[in-house]
Amino acid sequence: MPGVEVFDTPLGSVELDQNLVNKIAHLPQIVISREAHDLEHSLEVQLPFLQSVLGKFTLLPLAVGFTSAEAVADVLAHVWGGEETLIIVSSDLSHYLPYSIAQRMDQETMQSIVQLQKLVEHDRACGSIAINGLIVAAQQHHLTPHVLDL
């Protein structure tokens, strides 16, 4: 967690959900690290879109480092809510490949996710640990993924 109370965007501030922050702060997987969030930009580029679509909401930003998918799923289990809870895992999938190869690899990765296969490899997706953690959580909650776009 970043150790801040708000994330600022050109559209205004998004407050952190302090109830959820307090709910998971004691977990051994959780570390307060502003540096981890300073080096990562995936959330910042999505926040204005989320503000436009959702209006006012609270946020629990988690940067996932080197850990197991099960450890990520355990943290998600502590914050799993009802329909009011939106869990987003961000990935830009393959990197620095010729377009046709990237398309094929990204399609294969997407199929692994949709089929809830948890072994998305590091070389196939930036954020593979977080993706795999969400796959484990989806399996535990008997969810069925649906592809919106790729």
Where are these regions (language model features)?
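Active-site histidine-anchored catalytic micro-motif
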Residues: 1-150
